[in-house]
């Protein structure tokens, strides 16, 4: 009867040999986690389970210890550190039972890589488990090899490398295959092992078992991604395997391997390419065909003039793009893009296929197809492609599945990518594919409208740049473009949502303000709204107002009183901008404010009807000194590197300075204020010629012969210069009414702001005429625009949230030509360091225990009664602690040597 009242722990201990456990298993842990209702309850539950595992893992029973290690391994995935239990994991690894050993290796693969010291203790255990014997079955060796691959370090790889090479000669194909795959991680950490045992490893390519050959080819393929140089010598063997092997998996791995090798050895192309093309035609396996094309493209085997190989690849990809498998269609689009980058003529005839892919049910395929447009767009199909893309902003695509219709949701990132793609294909090659620029101007306006609801901030900048480029590069349509710009500036939605577009539009208004009729009203509009704009926009607004103000003041008929009133209206908002938080706005507003105040004082002092020189001569000289020319983005930054500034030579000598001060004539180089942007192209300042009749300086009348000579010389200078318009072109530029150009637009209440001076308002049906587009200027010979970097933000998504799975290895930078040095490594050094570390740790523990015992004895000496018993108690408490430590250490060491 006494057994009925035995302690609970004793009953559990007796029942465990029969397979009856009362501790919580991994299944109970998972059920408990799923039953928690809140994060707080889950955290409390996990903390309680972790404390239970800390007690269970110290138990002498290996079943309980294994169960605790298994639960700790699961909790490690929740972020709980289990490195404190590494010694207990090592004990479980040393168990003779396969189930317990497997749990130990699983836990070791998750925690041992953080602690190199414990791996040094586990080296002998690994070597013992890797040796085949009657007591050590094949599956046990497989578990050890799998665990080794997950926790290998440079030191462990060095110690275990020879044992793995011995396993390559095992009679069991399973062992040879597992050993080959384990060598992959070993070679990454210890490339000397590959260098010293290269022949032994390569011999597995001729193994009798196909699985071993497949594993060897796979390992070589993965190693070649890091350092392909040592495997080039294997090309003849691999080539013969590619011809003879029938296994598709091995063929795919061989093709991937040749892809890596051909990138550094161009001579392989001549030998490999014909066989790959033959394999691509003979096989029916889609995976092999795709990998063959990928090998040709990524292995640099396809030259830009090899049309036969390109056609063979593209025909196969065309069939893949019509497949029902969306994954195959996407991968085919990727290869289409890579082939198009080699030579765009290769994919020029696949416009029908690309049009079909642009409306694919899979949006990811549509997104990838957008990258193909650059290679197939011509002036004949540009409009079709753009219209197909614009319809996706308006129409709702539907798909029918099981007689049910589902609408295709177009994500925002794809809409942004469509707008970027439209801007790219229309502007490429200096707008060579655009035949109707009026259509293109209307297209940019539509894109501005559909971009208002998108969050991509780069769209506004991109569209604004396109509008600005049209104004600069297409002078024949500046009036039409300016009419569209006026509508965009008036739009409140553009002002609020697309400040990047508004910035470029305001710049165009200022730069080409001579085409505007009612300039004073534009000045007032921009000045009044200056407070509503962002600082980046205000930086452009201030000089734009001055440009419009300059052209307006120098018109033929302007009331002086009106000029004074408008000047005062400009000064008021500028006084508010000088206290802006943006330094650039402060500087520009201060400069403009001081100059306008001087102009206002000059207007007040001068009682005559003529304007002061500040308005007629000085202000126009700020902006009309040079003809604006388009240059490639980034050229100015590249140009600064080639300019040398001489800071030693004086700018003017004393005699030249005295002569300059004594000269009372007008300053050379000032452009007449009466000349507009287009008129300035046909009139040029001539030294010695009299300026306009604005001042009182003496004039010299030129004879007819002199004028003809000057005109002839000017024509000769402008021959071949694309940045000057011919006289016929200048005369053909008409200033038409913007309201007439925008006849299809809705009438606005502020229609007076959009009038242009018109010479003829007759409406005629316009024909599509190829207009002249100004090319980018070459500022300095020798500046390579290909080397110019662009610092503007890219619309490529950032990769900061991606998980970096690339592990550190020594194979990438290892030099296989370096001979082996026998004195590189002394195996006793690391062992001696470990012994010294443990000895130092033991001394620290003993000193801490001794100090604690002395303190207790001193305290107990003060009391006379019970001093001996107290000393005995203190010593009895201190001694078991040391014995317990020795016992734990003694228990660990036998566990490491248990058979």
From Swiss-Prot:
It is found in: Golgi apparatus; Cytoplasmic vesicle, Clathrin-coated vesicle membrane. Residues 841-862 form a coiled coil. Residues 743-759 have a biased composition (Low complexity). It comes from the Eukaryota. It is a peripheral membrane protein. Residues 668-701, 741-768, 782-801, 849-899 are annotated as: Disordered. Keywords: Coiled coil, Cytoplasmic vesicle, Golgi apparatus, Membrane, Protein transport, Repeat, Transport. SUPFAM superfamilies: ARM repeat (SSF48371). Residues 857-880 have a biased composition (Basic residues). Pfam families: Adaptin_N (PF01602). GO terms for biological process: Golgi to vacuole transport; protein targeting to vacuole. GO terms for cellular component: AP-3 adaptor complex; clathrin-coated vesicle membrane; endosome membrane; Golgi apparatus. InterPro entries: AP3_complex_dsu, ARM-like, ARM-type_fold, Clathrin/coatomer_adapt-like_N. Its main location: Golgi. HEAT repeats lie at residues 37-74, 155-192, 194-229, 231-267, 268-305, 308-344, 345-382, 384-428, 480-518, 536-580, 590-613, 614-656. Belongs to the adaptor complexes large subunit family. Adaptor protein complex 3 (AP-3) is a heterotetramer composed of 2 large adaptins (APL5 and APL6), a medium adaptin (APM3) and a small adaptin (APS3). Part of the AP-3 complex, an adaptor-related complex which is not clathrin-associated. The complex is associated with the Golgi region as well as more peripheral structures. It facilitates the budding of vesicles from the Golgi membrane and may be directly involved in trafficking to the vacuole. PANTHER family: AP-3 COMPLEX SUBUNIT DELTA-1, DELTA ADAPTIN-RELATED. This is AP-3 complex subunit delta. It comes from Eremothecium gossypii (strain ATCC 10895 / CBS 109.51 / FGSC 9923 / NRRL Y-1056).
């Amino acid at each position: 009867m006494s057994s009925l009242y035995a302690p609970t722990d004793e009953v559990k201990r007796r029942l465990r040999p029969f397979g009856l456990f009362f501790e919580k298993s991994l299944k109970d842990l998972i059920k408990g986690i799923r039953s928690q209702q809140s994060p707080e309850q889950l955290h409390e539950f996990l903390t309680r389970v972790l404390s239970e595992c800390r007690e269970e893992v110290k138990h002498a029973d290996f079943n309980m210890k294994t169960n605790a290690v298994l639960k700790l391994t699961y909790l490690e995935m929740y972020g709980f550190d289990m490195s404190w239990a590494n010694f207990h994991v090592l004990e479980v690894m040393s168990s003779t039972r396969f189930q317990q050993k497997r749990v130990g290796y699983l836990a070791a693969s998750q925690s041992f890589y953080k602690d190199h010291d414990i791996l040094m203790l586990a080296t002998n255990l690994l070597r013992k488990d890797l040796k085949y014997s009657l007591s050590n079955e094949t599956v046990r060796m497989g578990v050890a090899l799998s665990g080794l691959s997950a926790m290998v370090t440079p030191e462990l790889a060095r110690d275990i490398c020879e044992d793995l090479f011995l396993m390559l000669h095992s009679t069991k194909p399973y062992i040879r295959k597992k050993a080959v795959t384990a060598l992959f991680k070993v070679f990454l950490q210890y490339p000397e092992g590959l260098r010293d045992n290269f022949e032994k490893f390569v011999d597995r390519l001729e193994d009798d078992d196909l699985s071993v050959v497949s594993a060897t080819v796979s390992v070589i393929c993965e190693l070649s991604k890091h350092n392909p140089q040592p495997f080039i010598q294997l090309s003849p063997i691999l080539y013969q395997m590619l011809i003879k092997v029938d296994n598709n998996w091995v063929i795919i791995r061989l093709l991937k391997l040749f892809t890596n090798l051909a990138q550094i050895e161009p001579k392989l192309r001549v030998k490999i390419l014909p066989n790959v093309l033959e394999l691509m035609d003979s096989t029916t396996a889609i995976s092999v065909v795709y990998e063959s094309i990928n090998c040709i493209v990524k292995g640099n085997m396809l030259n830009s003039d090899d049309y036969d190989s390109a056609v063979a690849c593209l025909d196969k990809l065309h069939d893949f793009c019509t497949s029902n498998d969306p994954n195959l269609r996407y991968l085919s689009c990727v290869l289409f893009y890579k082939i198009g980058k080699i030579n765009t003529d290769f994919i020029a005839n696949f416009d029908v296929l690309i049009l079909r892919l642009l409306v694919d049910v899979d949006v990811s395929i549509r997104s990838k197809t957008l990258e193909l447009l650059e290679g197939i767009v011509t002036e004949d199909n540009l409009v079709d492609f753009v219209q197909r893309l614009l319809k996706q902003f308006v129409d709702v695509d539907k798909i029918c599945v099981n007689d049910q219709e589902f609408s295709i949701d177009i994500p925002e990132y794809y809409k942004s990518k469509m707008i970027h793609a439209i801007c790219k294909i229309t502007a490429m090659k200096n707008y060579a594919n655009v035949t109707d620029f009026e259509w293109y101007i209307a297209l940019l306006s539509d894109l501005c409208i559909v971009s208002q609801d998108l969050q991509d901030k780069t769209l506004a900048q991109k569209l604004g740049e396109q509008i600005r480029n049209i104004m600069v590069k297409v002078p024949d349509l500046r009036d039409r473009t300016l009419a569209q710009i006026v509508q965009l500036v008036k739009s409140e939605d553009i002002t609020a949502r697309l400040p990047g577009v508004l910035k470029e539009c305001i710049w165009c208004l200022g730069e080409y303000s001579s085409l505007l009729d009612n300039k004073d009203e534009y000045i007032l509009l921009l000045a009044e709204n200056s407070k509503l704009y962002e600082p980046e926009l205000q930086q452009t607004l201030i000089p734009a107002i001055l440009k419009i103000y300059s052209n307006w003041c120098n018109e033929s008929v302007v009331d002086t009183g009106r000029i004074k009133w408008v000047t005062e209206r400009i000064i008021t908002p500028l006084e508010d901008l000088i206290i802006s938080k943006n330094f650039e706005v402060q500087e520009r507003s201060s400069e403009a404010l001081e100059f306008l105040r001087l102009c206002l004082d000059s207007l007040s002092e001068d009682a005559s009807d003529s304007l002061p020189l500040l308005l007629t001569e000085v202000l126009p000289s700020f902006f009309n000194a040079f003809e604006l020319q388009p240059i490639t983005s980034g050229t100015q930054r590249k140009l600064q590197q080639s300019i040398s500034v001489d800071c030693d030579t004086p700018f003017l000598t004393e005699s030249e300075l005295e002569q300059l001060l004594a000269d009372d004539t007008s300053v050379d180089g000032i452009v007449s204020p009466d000349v507009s942007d287009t008129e300035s192209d046909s009139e040029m300042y001539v030294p010695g010629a009299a300026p306009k009749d604005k001042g009182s300086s003496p004039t010299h009348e030129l004879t007819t012969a002199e004028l003809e000579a000057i005109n002839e010389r000017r024509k000769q200078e402008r021959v071949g210069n694309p940045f000057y318009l011919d006289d016929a072109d200048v005369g053909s530029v008409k200033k038409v009414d913007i309201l007439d150009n925008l006849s299809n637009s809705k009438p606005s209440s502020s229609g007076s702001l959009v009038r242009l001076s018109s010479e003829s308002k007759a409406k005629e049906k316009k024909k599509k005429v190829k207009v002249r587009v100004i090319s980018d200027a070459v500022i300095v010979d020798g500046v390579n625009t290909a080397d110019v970097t662009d610092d503007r933000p890219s619309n490529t998504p950032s990769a900061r949230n991606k998980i970096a799975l690339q592990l550190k290895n020594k194979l990438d930078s290892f030099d296989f030509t370096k001979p082996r040095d026998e004195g590189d490594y002394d195996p006793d050094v690391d062992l001696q360091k470990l012994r010294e570390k443990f000895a130092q740790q033991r001394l620290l523990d003993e000193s801490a225990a001794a100090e604690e015992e002395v303190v207790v004895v001193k305290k107990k000496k003060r009391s006379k009664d019970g001093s001996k018993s107290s000393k005995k108690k203190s010593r009895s408490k201190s001694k078991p602690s040391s014995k317990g430590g020795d016992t734990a250490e003694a228990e660990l060491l036998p566990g490491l040597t248990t058979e």
